[in-house]
Regions:
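Alpha-helical metal-binding/catalytic segments enriched in His/Glu/Asp
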Residues: 63-67
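Extended beta-strand/beta-hairpin segments
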Residues: 1-61, 73-165
Length: 165
């Protein structure tokens, strides 16, 4: 999908992305999104088997990847040649939020803060690079937008009928 194609047919920009996540055991699950398998698990100190990043780490990875794409596309739009982009993405989370029922804690289960540090080696003055990073990381990143602005999430139960024996 190109910008010109979206100018001609704006409705074609509306997408529904989807995948399937299956529980394996304990805290280990596997997601299938397009043709990509993504494992998730918890660390051993919180009852997992450490067979993949935990879900909050996957959110940080998605944020870092999304900002990287936004920076690369923004630089290309401006004719700026990039030599490298590197991001450090970190988030503060209080596990009492996840275990709040057991601990009677009044703490959110999600991140309290997320910080992204970006290093860019580019053929452009520092002010131009800063503008590209701002545009790529704040203006056009869908993941940044989802984390900054509330998005309705609906969890619906579909009861499986046990197989006949």
């Amino acid at each position: 999908m190109t910008v010109n194609a979206l100018r001609k047919n704006p409705g074609e920009g509306l997408l529904t992305l989807s995948g399937v996540t299956d529980w394996n055991e304990g805290a280990h699950s596997t997601g299938l999104f397009r043709n990509f398998v993504i494992a998730a698990d918890e660390t051993e100190d919180v009852g997992g088997t450490n067979r993949g990043p935990n879900p909050p780490e996957l959110v940080l990875a998605a944020l870092g990847a999304c900002i990287t794409v936004g920076i690369a596309y923004s630089a290309a739009e401006d004719g700026v040649e990039l030599r490298s982009i590197e991001l450090d993405v970190e988030g503060d989370i209080d596990l009492k939020g996840f275990f709040k029922r057991d601990l009677n804690a009044d703490v959110r289960p999600g991140f309290q803060a997320i910080r992204v540090t970006v290093w860019v080696d580019a053929d452009a003055p520092p002010g131009k690079v800063a503008e590209i990073v701002r545009r790529g990381g704040e203006e056009r990143s869908p993941v940044t937008d989802m984390l900054v602005n509330p998005v309705p999430v609906t969890v619906r139960l579909e009861q499986k009928v046990p197989a006949k024996r």
